[in-house]
């Protein structure tokens, strides 16, 4: 059995405590007081008048809001309120809402929170009213709405995390809450607004664990059909795409891959087929692969495509091979290929090649030269080569190559080993348009 690729993501968290930094630490109360801006000093004074001086400000650990004082028009009246997060005597974190009257900040409401740190704060336009406040605590999510100078809790749940997207395309956002499960499945609750009320959809389950999701995007599944596309790593070096739709208050996991041979027998030859199913999953519609790529709109037609591998063995088997990739698009009745090529995930690009190469060409990876080489299967002759070169490296040694594309850090060179007229020849005019950076 071949070995799976092992891709390990490493996240570094930096903790600090100041008026312009984002994180809280366990030693926060022992450090010097933060340096406030003039406006923050006014807020701090207003807060002190209400709760005294024995409190510790709390800071969201990530997201766009990286201050203990956050400004937002909470009730939609055109004027910003301020929110402050704090704890007193190591109690749970509390939320204080302040409003500005004639240039002075005054506290108008205090709401209970939870124990532990604040991981993320978001403001979501869920309906015609003002935004709801979505707070991810250490192990729970809280959703709040500010009306009549009161911050009321409208949803609370233990969860792994949440994502915000306009999944149904109605111009308002839904909050997808990901809840862990002992059955290696993840429960998803969809929080949405309707008729001025906050509602919770019926639960659906997906294979993706929240921490393993590396790509998520909302877009069209096909014309007039909106969806949410999730790509995750379900085990070492094994990746899949799952699709969620949301209509009329109901969430659904879509199955769109009925067109392929699922290959139930390991000994059955499926050379050239797209494999979407394997192992013990027992369901159709899962794009299972060994290449870490996500859903894209490859042809810029406004409809999302899903990645699948074209391979001679089954996707449920471990593999260190480099496979051709097809991006498939759903047309309302079936999924059909619209893009064919290869993926170089280390250097962050896709490169389009003719579909006929899938059965007659092999791909070799050269770690020494950081290149992909395409060779004829029948004789091993080189056809085409792609180099990814750091812009800090000397470029002179690539004089025999064509600079086909570049990004902020790398130049991408190509070389054809066959002449014009050969069945494998790609014209220089097509090189640049064949790259998609991921």
Per-region residue spans from a language model:
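Generic cytosolic/nucleocytoplasmic N-terminal low-complexity/intrinsically disordered segments
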Residues: 1-2, 98
